[in-house]
C-alpha cells in the first residue's frame, strides 16, 4: 500500500491551499463517470440520486439508488439528516488567505467561494 509521508502530505496541503487547483477541488461531473451504474460502488453515476454503498444510509434506498421519500440529499458537506443545510451555513472553513465557503441552501455540495484567493 502506498501512503503519503508527513512531509508529502504537508506539501500537498500547502499546494492545494495556496493554488486552489480546480481539477483537484471540483467534484467530477456525472457524465465524466465512465463505468456502468452500479449500486453500492460509492460513485454517483448517471441515473442515480444517491449511492449509499451500504444499506445503513437513512437517506438513500440502496436497492434503487434513489433518495428516500422526503429526502433532499444523502451525503455532502451541506447535507444534514437528509436535508440541505440553510443558505449561509459554513461548510468549509477558511485556510490561509482563503475565505470560508458557505452552503447555498439548494444543494448538498459545498460550493467554492467565488472570491477565494
UniProtKB/Swiss-Prot annotation:
Its main location: secreted. GO terms for cellular component: extracellular region; plasma membrane. Keywords: Cell adhesion impairing toxin, Disulfide bond, Hemostasis impairing toxin, Hydrolase, Metal-binding, Metalloprotease, Platelet aggregation inhibiting toxin, Protease, Secreted, Toxin, Zinc, Zymogen. Transmembrane segments: none annotated. Its EC number is 3.4.24.-. Disulfide bonds join 50-65, 52-60, 59-82, 73-79, 78-103, 91-110. It comes from the Eukaryota. It is an enzyme of class 3 (hydrolase). SUPFAM superfamilies: Blood coagulation inhibitor (disintegrin). Belongs to the venom metalloproteinase (M12B) family. P-II subfamily. P-IIa sub-subfamily. Monomer. This is Zinc metalloproteinase/disintegrin. It comes from Gloydius halys.
Amino acid at each position: 500500500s502506498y501512503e503519503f509521508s508527513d512531509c508529502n502530505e504537508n506539501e500537498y496541503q500547502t499546494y492545494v491551499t495556496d493554488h486552489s487547483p480546480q481539477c483537484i477541488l471540483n467534484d467530477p461531473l456525472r457524465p465524466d463517470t465512465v463505468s456502468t451504474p452500479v449500486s453500492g460502488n460509492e460513485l454517483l453515476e448517471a441515473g442515480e440520486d444517491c449511492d449509499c454503498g451500504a444499506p445503513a444510509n437513512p437517506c438513500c434506498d440502496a436497492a434503487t439508488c434513489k433518495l428516500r421519500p422526503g429526502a433532499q440529499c444523502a451525503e455532502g458537506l451541506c447535507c444534514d439528516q437528509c436535508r440541505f443545510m440553510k443558505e449561509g451555513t459554513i461548510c468549509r472553513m477558511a485556510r490561509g488567505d482563503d475565505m470560508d465557503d458557505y452552503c447555498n441552501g439548494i444543494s448538498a455540495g459545498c460550493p467554492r467561494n467565488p472570491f477565494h484567493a
